[in-house]
Amino acid sequence: MAENSMYHTHISAKHRWLDLNLKEVWQYRDLIYLFTKRNFVVSYKQTILGPAWIFLTPLFTSIVQAFVFGGIAGIGTDGIPTFLFYLCSNAVWAYFANCLTSNANTFTANAYMFGKVYFPRLTTPISNVISTVIRFGIQMVLVLLFMVYYLFQGTLHPHWLWWLMIPVELVHLGILGMGFGIIISSMTTKYRDLTVLVDFGVSLWMYATPVVYPLSMLGEGWMRTVLQINPVT
């Protein structure tokens, strides 16, 4: 008769600042998949339009911004069609903002699970980022459709080499948003006011980032220098 397999869990103190133990996280990849699936189910549960909101949210936001900032305020977009400029900007900003806000309370929101069973705490932030990447990918389909439309209209002349940087920027913004979110989440366990402050702060941060206006609009003064320090710029 075959002997029963024995599993041993060794728990030890961490001695390094950066001790991610990615090998252990990879062993729990099935759990990351389940958390990612849960995020989608919870987000669109009991909604009439369901996942259609992934398209509708940036679409309506871009229409309003194109009307207000492009039409009324007359802010230029450096030769890019106004609606497409705001659609692309909103998609990228929403990706970063969701990576941050979804992880800003990840430890408090999942505290009931942390106290019952052991699993790498990094699995929940990673699943949040993966969910956001999937939403961004779906929104990029909408962006590409409008790009094709403007290309046929002859009003868009893109620099295709810049598209090669999209995967790099996705990783950069994802890690940045997740990192800020985890730091804030570790602090919200004691200071719950940060939960409200994060939503408010992200809204203000958008206006300190070239989302509703091009960076070239600021010229070469000190304001341009300040905005270039902004990691999301």
Can you annotate each of these PLM segments?
Residues 1-233:
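Hydrophobic transmembrane alpha-helices and immediately adjacent juxtamembrane helices
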